[in-house]
Amino acid sequence: MSKVASIVDVLQGKVAIGETVTVRGWVRTRRDSKAGLSFLAVYDGSCFDPIQAIINNDIENYESEILRLTTGCSVIVTGKVVESPAEGQAVELQAEKVEVTGFVEDPDTYPMAAKRHSIEYLREVAHLRPRTNIIGAVARVRHCLSQAIHRFFHEQGFYWVATPLITASDTEGAGEMFRVSTLDLENLPRSENGKVDFSQDFFGKESFLTVSGQLNGETYACALSKIYTFGPTFRAENSNTTRHLAEFWMVEPEVAFATLADNAKLAEDMLKYVFRAVLAERKDDLQFFEKHVDKDVITRLENFVNSDFAQIDYTDAIDVLLKSGKKFEFPVSWGIDLSSEHERFLAEEYFKSPVVVKNYPKDIKAFYMRLNDDEKTVAAMDVLAPGIGEIIGGSQREERLEVLDKRMEEMGLNPDDYWWYRDLRKYGSVPHSGFGLGFERLIVYVTGVQNIRDVIPFPRAPRNANF
């Protein structure tokens, strides 16, 4: 019995020329020659390229099955690895046996037929779109990036912490949260003042899907020193744009005793590490994106890993924007939250490199960010990347209880709701810092795929929760 191998192993020469091997996958294309040969391009998802299998018409099921094969049919091909005379790949399979495990019922109506489909159409058939070149490549890049992130933090001595998806806290203080409830919507319990009585709900209080694992992560950082979370987060933000998802993944490290400068260095080291990994490990997929999606994909990543990060205070960044002579869609003044056009001008035109903007006005940032001595700004930072703008947001956290309480009061938050978070400041408080990286935004940056809904397997967005 021949050994089973992945197509990537065969194409990379891990199976010797002349050896008999079995590959299992799906037909991308079939073409027939007048000489009584059929050529199957078979893929199994292990790499971008399919392998070519050459089938003689003397194979017993040639007439009955091989000539009926169409795009999407599943096959098990056993054959000898031979050198390929054709350009494009070094080896091919001289088939000795082809077992058809599944035909496509009606090739004419198969949604993934060989013709090229628009990315918008593929969203409507998200259960089948992994079979396409583009979504298969995105999936492999996504895997590579996630593994590189875990590897980076492991090598740096971090511990991964599983923070809860159901929470009673609003980390961002923005209120755009999905409520979790088992109450009967047709018969809601009411308190004396007429409001919904959540004490009768499953958790005995109002509960939500998390918008961030940060606050929970801080509790572990204040015991294990260096932790990170990596998991799904949820925002009930009614934004139907190419940049927003209702469910997305976040990477959130948190480090005890770390300053804002330490935080910026960690962000730079992590991004460069994962970009080097994807350049080394997913070259075939990146070349596809370079050819068909964004010609600057590889150059952009190479420039990024070879760039020193610029740093600028928010106040100085506002001056740069005001003096640029450029007419922005959103007017520039001290106190605004930088828009994407401002961020991209700084990274792409002014610095021409990744840039860390730090020390933002306190009124546009979250309650947990450390108040600076000027009492107008907080020790917050954003990493801006050429080609996309903000890719990471973080801060040094407020470790002084009285300052934290005052900030919560200013923002209309009830300290009692955050009693456990305040406890961290009562019992051995330490300066600490962390940041958040939207994982899908990272994939958009790496692949050049413009719509964030195309880099997550099953996108969740306003009025869209199919599959």
UniProtKB/Swiss-Prot annotation:
SUPFAM superfamilies to which the protein is assigned, alphabetical: Class II aaRS and biotin synthetases, Nucleic acid-binding proteins
Protein name: Asparagine--tRNA ligase
Pfam families: tRNA-synt_2, tRNA_anti-codon
Top class in the EC scheme: ligase
Reaction equation(s) it catalyzes: tRNA(Asn) + L-asparagine + ATP = L-asparaginyl-tRNA(Asn) + AMP + diphosphate + H(+)
Highest taxon above the source species: Bacteria
Similarity section: Belongs to the class-II aminoacyl-tRNA synthetase family.
UniProt-annotated location(s): Cytoplasm
Gene Ontology biological process: asparaginyl-tRNA aminoacylation
Single GO MF annotation: asparagine-tRNA ligase activity
Lineage of producing organism: Bacteria, Pseudomonadati, Pseudomonadota, Gammaproteobacteria, Pasteurellales
Principal subcellular localisation of the protein: cytoplasm
This protein's record includes keyword ATP-binding: yes
Protein EC: 6.1.1.22
Species this protein is from: Haemophilus influenzae (strain ATCC 51907 / DSM 11121 / KW20 / Rd)
Family annotation (InterPro entries): Aa-tRNA-synt_II, aa-tRNA-synth_II, aa-tRNA-synth_II/BPL/LPL, Asn-tRNA-ligase, Asp/Asn-tRNA-synth_IIb, NA-bd_OB-fold, NA-bd_OB_tRNA
